[in-house]
């Protein structure tokens, strides 16, 4: 059995690593929509096999995509797993090309045996990421003073802390469940300025959303053995849907903060 001191030490390491996971390491204009770019909900072992996860069952790997897989671990094993990803992306609009390189600390998980028929896992991983910065200049040749510069940028994302357990109910059948806590803040900003007209104040619109909610995943795995060396595992996961609890606002700022001429208008909270 795993000692409580060792478990506590690993849990503290997970919390310290949460600061690295919470950092935004995304640079994509597509994250403007929805909750941003959804993170790949899979471990390194799952990604190496093309994203397959529900049927994976390995006593040396944490498969948090299906909590029924936790029972594969033996009583002498304690698993502490982390993931890092690197991304190299090229963007093009037909005339302009841009390259973006990003790195991120994907997940921190641990898994251990509770008893002969039960095992537990907990971990911290990202759920979505928002990160972009774009600019557009609209030139008015007839009235240069009305030429405008638009800027769009956003950041934030959602994070997921889960606790799960798996149980072996029959020799070849295991079931399990993960309960996850979601939290995060997402901010989108749109700014318009008029470089050729100093008398026209710039306008900045900030849309922010703060989310705190939960997620439940229920999984099952059935393993059929063929001979002495081969077996096949069928996995299934059910996640009940529900609305995320969120607190949103829209704020308009009229003026130039450098000169101190700023007017803030905060609208009613959106639910």
Language model segments and positions:
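Outer-membrane beta-barrel porins/channels
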Residues: 23-48, 113-271
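N-terminal, post-signal peptide beta-strand-biased segments of exported outer-membrane/organellar beta-barrel
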Residues: 21-128
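Generic hydrophobic alpha-helical membrane-segment signal
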Residues: 6, 11, 36-39, 54, ...
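Residue-level recognition of conserved structural "scaffold" positions that shape functional pockets
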Residues: 10, 57-58, 130, 183
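Bacterial Sec-dependent N-terminal signal peptides
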Residues: 1-27
């Amino acid at each position: 059995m795993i000692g409580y001191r060792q478990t506590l030490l690993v849990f503290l390491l997970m919390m310290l690593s949460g600061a690295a996971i919470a950092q935004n390491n995304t640079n994509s204009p597509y994250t403007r929509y929805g909750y941003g770019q959804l993170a790949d909900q899979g471990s390194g072992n799952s990604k190496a096999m093309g994203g397959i996860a529900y049927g994976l069952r390995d006593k040396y790997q944490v498969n948090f995509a299906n909590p029924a897989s936790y029972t594969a671990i033996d009583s002498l094993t304690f698993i502490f797993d982390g993931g890092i990803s690197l991304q190299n992306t090229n963007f093009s609009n037909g005339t302009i090309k841009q390259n973006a390189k990003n790195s991120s600390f994907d997940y921190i998980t641990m898994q251990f045996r509770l008893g002969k028929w039960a095992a537990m896992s907990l971990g911290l991983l990202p759920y979505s990421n928002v990160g972009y910065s774009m600019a557009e200049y609209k030139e008015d040749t007839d009235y240069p003073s009305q030429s405008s510069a638009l800027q769009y940028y956003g950041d934030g994302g959602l994070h997921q802390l889960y606790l799960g357990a798996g149980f072996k109910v029959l020799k070849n059948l295991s079931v399990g469940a993960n309960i996850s806590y979601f939290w995060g803040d997402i901010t989108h900003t749109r700014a318009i300025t008029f470089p050729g007209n100093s008398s026209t104040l710039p306008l900045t619109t900030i849309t922010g959303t703060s989310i705190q909610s939960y997620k439940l995943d229920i999984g099952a795995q059935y393993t059929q053995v063929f001979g002495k060396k081969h077996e096949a595992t069928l996995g299934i996961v059910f996640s009940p849907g529900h609305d995320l609890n969120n607190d949103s606002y829209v704020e308009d700022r009229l003026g130039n903060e450098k000169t101190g001429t700023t007017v803030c208008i905060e609208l009613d909270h959106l639910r």
